[in-house]
Amino acid sequence: LVFFAEFLGATGVFERWVSACPLAYRSGNAPDKRDVLGTLMLGLLAGHRRYAHITALRGDAVAAQALGMNKVVSEDALRRALARIDNASSTAWMRPALMHSVREALDRPWVLDIDASIKPLYGRQEGAEIGYNPSKPMRPSHVLHTFLVGNLRLVLDVQVSSGKQHSSGHAKAALGRLLDELGDKRPALVRGDSGYGNEGVLLELEGRGQPYL
């Protein structure tokens, strides 16, 4: 954890990420933005999946110092901070940051694979609907339309859709957006199964002069 935190700090990746974040406070008693985002980053690096797990970081002063933080904030402070960032602002913040982290790995010809997988859901979650689900029939699910580098198995983007939006047409807009963001780093070939061989997806590719299989 400490070594990776030091890497993020030394390379400037964490600093750029914090500077671009749209989170802003007006109260003088509010936590520092760097402490909030640093806590989130340390939690992700530690493999935490729930806000409650953040408590385990409170005693790790070394990792916090590696990111230039004053302290690790509480789980409640982190939850409230992330709730302040609307979806449009978070997308404009995170997508360039994520793309910056992978662009240099795409300097050689590569293949973009498209795949859809069904994620069964338990409990109440937004977008959970009963749709095509061969492993758990009649179980609500999400559909994950995934775009990844074929040779590296490196995920570039995921379109999370409701359980009824399993057809390839629901990935068309996300595919076009990703290709536009890649610019001169576009794949030599876009590859998908027969479900993606429909007119809408093919027009999206041909309109950009993008080879496909």
Regions flagged by a language model, labelled:
Residues 115, 187-197:
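Acidic/histidine-rich, metal-coordinating catalytic segments
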Residues 1-181, 205-208:
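Dynamic "connector" segments at or just before major functional cores
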Residues 200-203:
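Catalytic cores of alpha/beta
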Residues 211-213:
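Short hydrophobic alpha-helical runs that function as membrane-insertion/retention elements
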Residues 167, 197-198:
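Alpha-helix N-cap/loop-to-helix initiation residues
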